[in-house]
Amino acid sequence: MKKDINIKTIKKVGIVAKSSPELVQNLKTIEKILSGYGVEILLESAVAKELNLNGYETGELARNCDFLISLGGDGTIISLCRQTAEISPFVLGIHAGRLGFLTDITMNECEKFFADFFSGKFEVEKPHMLDVFLHEKSGKTLQKIAFNDAVIVSAKSAAMTQIEACLNGKYFNYYFGDGVIIATPVGTTAYNMSANGPIIYPLSEVFTVTPICSHSLTQRPVVLPHDFEVKFKTSSDAMLVIDGQDRYKMSNLTAVSARLSDKSARLIRHVGRDYFQILKEKLHWGYND
């Protein structure tokens, strides 16, 4: 894992991108800007294939580049950070489409941003991810990583789930409803927010457990310290969904447990990026309708 970014020695930057009609033009724009700083662009294999070029696997890019660019939306950067969690590369999110919470730099801002970046005017945020443990009936435990959240929901449409929860090995709660969301601080502005969960400052060392449409009015979200572990069991026909990308049948597992991970993403940001201003703009806070 690279300890820091030395802007004077940056030679290679890898790009992972979501396919779009503007992809080729966006890549040309970024390449033109970075070539002016003597930086070589390397493409992830799926991106390179679209352009009939040679590319590199994501892990290879992460190990051999000074930092990575995620060109797309929040889903692209989430997938990239999950795939490279063991390597923990520096990642810059440039959005191509709807403005997200994670990819706050637009294509129109690239030239100005990189001028600031190569002048040393940037910050690195390190939001924690979530360790998710899948306890199989065979006795084997699989460890996965979540950037935003892990969600347990019914595998059948309009069906309820019954979920038992334990905290640090002690019985804690019994959820009866549409499911539960275990979210990182960054993930609290995703599905968690839609389920009326709390919004947590993204660099906090806590995580949340939020019931989805509980059948009891007394059920409320809880915010847990970083050293707590929560375990869930269910006899319902349910699914575990990690970041909306990976799905696992709960019927194949005895339990699922989660805790705040020691692993964190390393996101390159504008200097002075104001998280609460972003919340205000996206959630239309402070407006008198």
Curated annotation (Swiss-Prot):
Please name one Pfam family that this protein belongs to. Answer: NAD_kinase
Q: Which Gene Ontology cellular component terms are annotated?
A: cytoplasm
User: Where does this polypeptide localize?
Assistant: Cytoplasm
Q: According to its UniProt record, which reaction does this protein catalyse?
A: NAD(+) + ATP = ADP + NADP(+) + H(+)
GO MF terms on file? Answer: ATP binding; metal ion binding; NAD binding; NAD+ kinase activity
Main location class: cytoplasm
EC class of this enzyme?
A: transferase
Source taxon at top rank:
Bacteria
Listed A to Z, the keywords are: ATP-binding, Cytoplasm, Kinase, NAD, NADP, Nucleotide-binding, Transferase
**Binding-site residues for NAD(+), renumbered to this chain:** D74, G75, N148, D149, D178, V186, T189, A190, Y191, N192, M193, S194, Q245
Q: Which cysteines are joined by disulfide bonds?
A: none
Gene Ontology terms: biological process: NAD metabolic process; NADP biosynthetic process
Q: Give the matching InterPro entries.
A: ATP-NAD_kinase_N, ATP-NAD_kinase_PpnK-typ_C, NAD/diacylglycerol_kinase_sf, NADK
List the active-site residues.
Answer: D74
Which cofactor(s) are needed, names only?
A: a divalent metal cation
Query: What EC numbers are recorded for this enzyme?
Result: 2.7.1.23
UniProt family annotation: Belongs to the NAD kinase family.
Supply the HAMAP family for this chain. Answer: NAD_kinase
Per its database record, what is this protein's job?
Involved in the regulation of the intracellular balance of NAD and NADP, and is a key enzyme in the biosynthesis of NADP. Catalyzes specifically the phosphorylation on 2'-hydroxyl of the adenosine moiety of NAD to yield NADP.
The record's NCBIfam families line, in alphabetical order, gives:
PRK14077.1
The name this protein goes by in its record = NAD kinase
Annotated source species = Campylobacter curvus (strain 525.92)
